């Protein structure tokens, strides 16, 4: 991954974390690497544990950011979330899976939040 792309991704995650804090959520972890994949942001709001996938783009020529979270990516996030819950012993909290799309327009950010962007059958 190029430095420029990594830098854009980090910028988007910083924007998303700030947005979540302003919504009253507590950021528990960021960029967690698990044996089964990475989690961008883990936040808590009341009795809910929110796993947030952040997608950042400069424009829409490669599609809208949220479109990059397909079925395979959802499965990877689910496996990583299961690992996180077991490792941290937080299984009493209700999980939710969100996507935050960040589009960079010059120095400005456009944030779109999709709470409960995908559901997990049988959770």
Curated annotation (Swiss-Prot):
Pfam families associated with the record: UPF0102 (PF02021)
Originating organism: Syntrophotalea carbinolica (strain DSM 2380 / NBRC 103641 / GraBd1) (Pelobacter carbinolicus)
Name of the molecule in the record: UPF0102 protein Pcar_2217
Listed GO MF terms: nucleic acid binding
NCBIfam families: PRK12497.1-3, PRK12497.3-3, YraN family protein
Similarity comment: Belongs to the UPF0102 family.
Classification via InterPro entries: Restrct_endonuc-II-like (IPR011335), tRNA_endonuc-like_dom_sf (IPR011856), UPF0102_YraN-like (IPR003509)
């Amino acid at each position: 991954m190029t430095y420029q792309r990594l830098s854009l991704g980090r910028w988007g995650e910083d924007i998303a974390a700030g947005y979540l804090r302003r919504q009253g959520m507590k950021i528990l972890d960021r960029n967690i690497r698990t044996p089964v994949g990475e989690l961008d942001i883990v936040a808590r709001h009341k009795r809910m544990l929110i796993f947030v996938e952040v997608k950042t783009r400069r424009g829409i020529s490669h599609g809208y950011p949220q479109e990059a979270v397909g079925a395979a990516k959802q499965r990877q996030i689910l496996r990583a979330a299961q690992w996180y819950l077991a490792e941290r012993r937080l299984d009493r909290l209700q999980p939710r899976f969100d996507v935050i799309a960040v589009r960079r327009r010059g120095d400005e950010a456009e944030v779109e939040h999709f709470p409960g962007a995908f559901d997990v059958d049988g959770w």
